[in-house]
């Protein structure tokens, strides 16, 4: 997959992102429901002098799951150890991490849905009983010993909650879904980030940038840095709505936040397959992209904003999609199955 300026996935260019992350819940913009619940749970745990219950954060990439995990640790006044599902390949890897935790520490596992079943089996007693089962020896003489662990908080993050096994999901006491951000929330985030990065941005520039950021703070911050470059070279260093529009045109990002890959997907459905329904595997083969990438990275935005309908027979382009691309929508009932 080629690198996209508006990809919600992390890129090497996002090294600046950590400096933009808030450190307290009161500074965290958006996600009011999740934030309000976490505030109650954190305050209650601190009053009792206990570790916070295990937390599962899920939703599309780039919405602030990692940021919230770090905020939880800061609010609890404890350390955080971060890793990801693909990195923990063997039970011994997880055991090494767990045995080095201090009481009430936060263990953050990104992409937790990618943990192997063998590693998950080790995690169950660790989450529920704060014990680690270690097998000594092999064969008939093998025996299991239980090692006590400090009470810790596991914060898991995933973009695909449906792939979590039921036993793992059931062990999380707090489950929060993160939603796409509103334009107003993103405008506030852009203004805050511009202040931290010492970038001059006008209110209309922040609003225009937010409108094209696909409801995702990571994309908004990345576009802010790209537009800053344009403003410094071709403008007076101040980001206005006009500067945003001109710079994003150069990046081939339209007024809806679509880039070339979004247009390729939508026009493939509309022009090649008559608007659908068309299967995801067929779309992937037609555009030369992986099925999972389309489903995880591209589709959430297109579905959320009403450009694609997901049906039992396949993906279907909506009336809004036809209007956006200047196409005439077919009469109801038309379309072929691929």
From Swiss-Prot:
One of its GO terms (cellular component) is cytoplasm. Its EC number is 3.6.4.-. ATP binds at residues 20-21, 62, 65-67, 128-130, 171, 181, 218. The gene is ruvB. Residues 255-338 are annotated as: Head domain (RuvB-H). It comes from the Bacteria. It is an enzyme of class 3 (hydrolase). This is Holliday junction branch migration complex subunit RuvB. SUPFAM superfamilies: P-loop containing nucleoside triphosphate hydrolases, Winged helix' DNA-binding domain. Keywords: ATP-binding, Cytoplasm, DNA damage, DNA recombination, DNA repair, DNA-binding, Hydrolase, Nucleotide-binding. Disulfide bonds: none annotated. The RuvA-RuvB-RuvC complex processes Holliday junction (HJ) DNA during genetic recombination and DNA repair, while the RuvA-RuvB complex plays an important role in the rescue of blocked DNA replication forks via replication fork reversal (RFR). RuvA specifically binds to HJ cruciform DNA, conferring on it an open structure. The RuvB hexamer acts as an ATP-dependent pump, pulling dsDNA into and through the RuvAB complex. RuvB forms 2 homohexamers on either side of HJ DNA bound by 1 or 2 RuvA tetramers; 4 subunits per hexamer contact DNA at a time. Has 3 domains, the large (RuvB-L) and small ATPase (RuvB-S) domains and the C-terminal head (RuvB-H) domain. The head domain binds DNA, while the ATPase domains jointly bind ATP, ADP or are empty depending on the state of the subunit in the translocation cycle. During a single DNA translocation step the structure of each domain remains the same, but their relative positions change. Belongs to the RuvB family. GO terms for molecular function: ATP binding; ATP hydrolysis activity; four-way junction DNA binding; four-way junction helicase activity. Mg(2+) binds at residue 66.
């Amino acid at each position: 997959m080629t690198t996209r300026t508006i990809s919600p996935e992390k890129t090497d260019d996002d090294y600046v992102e950590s400096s933009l992350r808030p450190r307290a819940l009161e500074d965290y913009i958006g996600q009011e429901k999740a934030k309000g619940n976490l505030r109650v749970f954190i305050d209650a745990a601190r009053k009792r002098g206990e570790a916070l219950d295990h937390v599962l954060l899920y939703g599309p990439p780039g919405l602030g799951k990692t940021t919230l995990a770090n905020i939880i640790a800061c609010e609890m006044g404890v350390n955080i150890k971060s890793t990801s599902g693909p990195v923990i390949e063997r039970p011994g890897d997880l055991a090494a991490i767990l045995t080095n935790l201090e009481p009430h520490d936060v263990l953050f596992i990104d992409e937790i849905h990618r943990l192997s079943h063998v590693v998950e089996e080790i995690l169950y007693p660790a989450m529920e009983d704060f014990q680690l089962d270690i097998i000594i020896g092999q064969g008939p003489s093998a025996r299991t010993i239980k090692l006590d662990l400090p009470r810790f908080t596991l914060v898991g993050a995933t973009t695909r909650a449906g792939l979590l096994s039921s036993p793992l999901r059931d062990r999380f006491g707090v489950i929060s879904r993160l939603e796409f951000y509103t334009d107003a929330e993103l405008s506030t985030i852009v203004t805050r980030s511009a202040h931290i990065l010492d970038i001059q941005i006008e209110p209309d520039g922040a609003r225009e940038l937010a409108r094209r950021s696909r409801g995702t703070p990571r994309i908004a911050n990345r576009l802010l840095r790209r537009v800053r470059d344009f403003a410094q070279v071709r403008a007076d260093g101040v980001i206005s709505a006009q500067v945003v529009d001109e710079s994003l045109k150069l990046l081939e990002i339209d007024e809806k936040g679509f880039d070339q890959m979004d247009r390729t997907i939508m026009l493939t459905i509309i022009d090649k397959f008559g608007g659908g329904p068309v299967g995801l595997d067929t779309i992937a083969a037609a555009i030369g992209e992986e099925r999972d990438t389309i489903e995880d990275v591209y589709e959430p935005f297109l579905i959320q904003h009403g450009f694609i309908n997901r049906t039992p027979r396949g993906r279907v382009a909506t009336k809004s999609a036809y209007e956006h691309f200047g196409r005439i929508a077919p009469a109801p009932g038309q379309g072929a199955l691929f």
